[in-house]
Amino acid sequence: MAHPTASAWKIIPQFQSLSINRTLQFYTTELGFQTGGVHPENNSNPTFCSLFTGPKAEANIYFRLCEAGDFHAGSAWIALGTAELDAFYEKVKGEGRVTIVEELEDKAWGYRQFAVKDDDGNVLTFFKFLEGGNPGTD
């Protein structure tokens, strides 16, 4: 019998945020994410939010409010479809409102990738596999 953790089907990273409202604005406006939830609801100063993108919210990130002295930036990787990776990079670069910390490049380890930084310093690396297996046209 397989170990019980072999049934895992999703991972949700949790980042810290110095302003949930600013985080919501950045991820929805600049990166195209959708809001999954905010806590407390109907509050002008939320302490938590869930943001997602992709089918069935497959790329989901939680953000918790953190005091500046306790803040530590995080990072996560998000796989995109074959055609969408380059198109998204061109969109982000062309608009010039998002800090690109790593330009789009094919890597020796078999990924084509680029990375962006949010307003708090959290880094998202968007990638696709060079050998195929990505959704979309290879």
State the predicted function of each range.
Residues 1-25, 76-78, 127-138:
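N-terminal beta-strand motif that seeds the catalytic metal site of vicinal oxygen chelate
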Residues 13-15, 36-40, 103-106:
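Short beta-strand-to-loop elements that line the ligand-binding cleft
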Residues 34-75, 123-128:
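Conserved short beta-strand elements that form part of the metal-binding/catalytic scaffold
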